């Protein structure tokens, strides 16, 4: 019924549109352009296949992240990755690395897209394998290109492109010499607090822009967040995991206007995002109850981006250019996933290693006392020795030999004696043990390893009795923290030259752009792991023990040979060989105006990409030995039993061999758009464009060896390619328009992980072999996506002046897509060339209806959006892990249901320099989950899990219920 109601609304808008368009008198407009920006932008300025939002539109819609950017768009969504947040976009049936993300002309970090790597590591939360985001307050403009378009961005633009352009001082200093702005806001969905300061100024020939933004918030609170039991852990947890999220960004640009035609700009862009929390839903999380130690997974994930840029612009018109722009960028991106596993749930309650319920301590005089400042006493009950505080409550202490206890003089003033509960050793046939407080002198000594001072305990004269034991807390006094810190690094150096030239040949007008780029991108991985004695209590700081009868400050007095008070870090290692990717590109475009009714836009680009891996033994982070042992160079130990040194040497040789194999790719990309305006109110357009994605270095070089699953490199992969065809009809008048667009995008040479055969691995002694299953990345799939998109906006003032300021809008996206399936037994599979396998990245049918009003002088405005998404049908999903055995269902069991949302956003300007904005989202408090969120659920691993049988835990993937957002901005 809801879908039918939406259809009625659609017919209403189209009916209005027909009346308007029949009388229209418009200039040329381009195909399927969706512009959500200021109302002053005319329809004919929209570009082919774009969604364009400027800074004003972003503020009006209260956009704070990538999800908000596409909230009211159809045919483009955000990829979800659970704990790590979002990861790029999904357009035309493909996602992540197949949709280019660009900031100021620079590609952002790509995910490690090798399916083998994803299966081995991504499902366990070991890596922050996402695409970094961008700070909205820094943006001048965001442009989303639907469909293949390699002309703009080169590799990666298989299904589309999302590009961002940062602000410049000139954006604020058009008619004044200074600007200051401050924005503050709050979002209830994630408890986010926003503070942003913008300052711009001009002095003489110099200008400056500085934007600093801070966001402090928490996890996105799913529907019903407050009512779910927070003590439930692992895959059946319904409540979102708790995180504290901090985002800080600084954008600085200094410009120097040498003269009217020459300008230099130096830029600095630094963004740091941190998310700290507890991974309660992870399958490795210990239960709160039971006798086991409560080791908790503490996450500390980061996404950091820093770019330093230099830009030279020239506006001297000559035979070669009207404008010239030369740019150099140095960008560094680090995506970090850190995990610390230690107990701190409820301090002493759940962490017995640091429990001290009696409040035992040593006072300023060196006396060992309880929390009541009383002494500890002993009482023998049957065969057991028990110890009590001054109030008669049992105390956890244990006796240790005096000779085994040492004092850390770096933590305790060893000039003072100690009074400790002590006992004689007169049992076993002699007199009963005596338990009394004795005073010990401390004699300082120097550690042989230079690690500070220590002291031994020597009892003051006590007659013939020998006190050989002292009593100290029995608990370890520290929590063991096993930590892992894994970074994915992308370091880019890029040079661009871009030129424009307008000219006329006979009666034909040409607006040409041309140029090129050269970039070097270094991609690497660093894995660090180690141990630390975390949350050390006083007794673990003051006392220590011996190892092999020698003083060792790393040895707990109450531990064993497997425990330590000292932190250590393992050797740096990596699962990937570092690779430098060199890219060179040349491009040319020409917007040709043949006459007043016919326009032709043509473009060509050539890309050449070279992967150059580097591995230097002893310098490059080491690949784990077993990962590559004997893969290319046979392992032949000298003796029957191989030594570890021999294995390491062979592994290093294999890594060097793999790194010697360079790979190259080249691509020719084309784009052509034909526009015909047979009448003043009608435009007909046809577009053809191509895109490609060169294999990433990890898809080529990733190697992994294990008896149950081995992946071998493939140096002969081809680039993925796409062809996009569109036809559109646009009716328009003044600011009102209706565009109906039919499109088809064909993909081929999709990269996929394929089973090859059974193989063998070197194992144990020199002649032993172990069977394994061999996999490899290959090109094989082809795919096709077809669809219909409608985009319309009716300004009622174009129909009736009395309704000036009111507007209606409607958007629709309907897509269907299939890729070729595989047949045959493992190792002999082939494509059927039949497009019969669903593509999961395609969104269900989506409608967005908008009703709005804006005051003619922009003193206030209000917009209401109604979004309806259909349910994701079972037949339109594909279980990529389907094998007919362990995974018997070839479709995805858990899918998104249909939902309808209502959002209300308003703003008011009480005075010229102040703007107040507020929005209520999911006004009807609907419980729902988006398809992108639901499809992030994994069937195996440890993260993003639910109970696949009952569905328990799926509510954790729901979107927020009713929530609000407010902000205030002041400008001068």
From Swiss-Prot:
PROSITE patterns: TONB_DEPENDENT_REC_3. Residues 1-22 form the signal peptide. CDD domains: ligand_gated_channel. It is found in: Cell outer membrane. Transmembrane segments: none annotated. One of its GO terms (molecular function) is siderophore uptake transmembrane transporter activity. Keywords: Cell outer membrane, Membrane, Receptor, Signal, TonB box, Transmembrane, Transmembrane beta strand, Transport, Virulence. One of its GO terms (cellular component) is cell outer membrane. Disruption phenotype: Mutant cannot utilize hemoglobin as the sole source of heme for growth. Mutation attenuates the virulence. This is Hemoglobin and hemoglobin-haptoglobin-binding protein. It comes from Haemophilus ducreyi (strain 35000HP / ATCC 700724). The gene is hgbA.
